[in-house]
Amino acid sequence: KERKELVSVSKKNHLSTFLAGAFLFGHFFCWFNAVKLTNIGSAVVLAALHPLVVIVLTVFVFKRKVSMRQILGIVLALLGGTMVAGFDYRELSQGNFIGDILAFLAAIFMGLYFAIGNEVRKEVSGKVYVFLVFLACWICFTIGVIATKTPVLGYSLKDYVLILGLTLVCQIGAHAVFNLCFGYVDSLYVSAWESGESVFAIILSIIFLGQFPTQWEIMGCAVVVAGLLYYNYFSSKQEK
C-alpha cells in the first residue's frame, strides 16, 4: 500500500516534502552550532520561539483564524520555558551574537518545517511522509558533511553510542511522532505542545540523573503546564 502511494505522490508534494526536510536539516544545523557558540540559556529560549513562527504562517499565509486566547496560552508556555532555562536577558549580550542568530534561525526553520508538514499531510499518509521527509533531511545532511568536510570517523565508542541514541530516540523518534500527529491536529497545536519539552526534561533529569529542580524551575514548569492547558482548552472550544 505504502509503495503504491509513494509512486503516486504528486510532484508538488514531493517538492514540498523535500523543502520540509531541508528546513529540518537547517534546524539541526543551526541548533547544534548555536549551542557551541552561545550560552545554553540563550539557545534554548531563542530556539523555542517556533510556535510564534507557526502562528505567523497560520494567520498570514494559510489564512486560518487563531484566537488571542490561544496566542496567550502559547506565550505563557514560552515564558515558563524561559523560567525553566534560567534565562536572563543579559545572557543575550554575554553570549556570542552569531550563536544567538543561529538559535533564532533554528526556531524559524522548525516553524517552517512544521507548517509545510501540516499541509502535505492532508494529502500524504503518515508513513510515506515520514519516509520522504527524513530521506530529504539525510540527503541534505550528506551534502552538508561533504561541503563542510566534517569527519564522520575517529570518534570514541561512547560518542557513537550517544550519537546513535540521540538520533534514534530524540530526533527520528520525536519527529516521526510530530509528523504523524499532523494527520490529526494542526501544526500550531503540535508546535505549542512541543514547547512543553522543558517540563519533561525536568522529570527525566529527576528519574535518570537524580537532579532535582529549583523552586524557580518548578514555577516555570507550572507556568508551562498552565499555558498549554489554557491553549488546549480554547483550541477545543474553537473546534466546536
Regions found by a protein language model. Give the residues of each.
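A helix-boundary/kink motif common to multi-pass secondary transporters
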Residues: 39, 65-67, 125-126, 186-189, ...
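Non-cytosolic membrane-interface motifs at loop->transmembrane helix junctions
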Residues: 42-46, 98-101, 160
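Hydrophobic alpha-helical transmembrane segments of multi-pass membrane transport proteins
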Residues: 18-37, 57, 83, 101-116, ...
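Hydrophobic residues within alpha-helical transmembrane segments
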Residues: 15, 19-22, 49, 71-78, ...
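Hydrophobic/aromatic residues within transmembrane alpha-helices
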Residues: 34, 46, 60-62, 66, ...
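Membrane-interface interhelical linkers
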Residues: 1-19, 32, 60-72, 89-98, ...
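Hydrophobic transmembrane alpha-helices of multi-pass small-molecule transport proteins
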Residues: 57, 66-88, 141, 195, ...
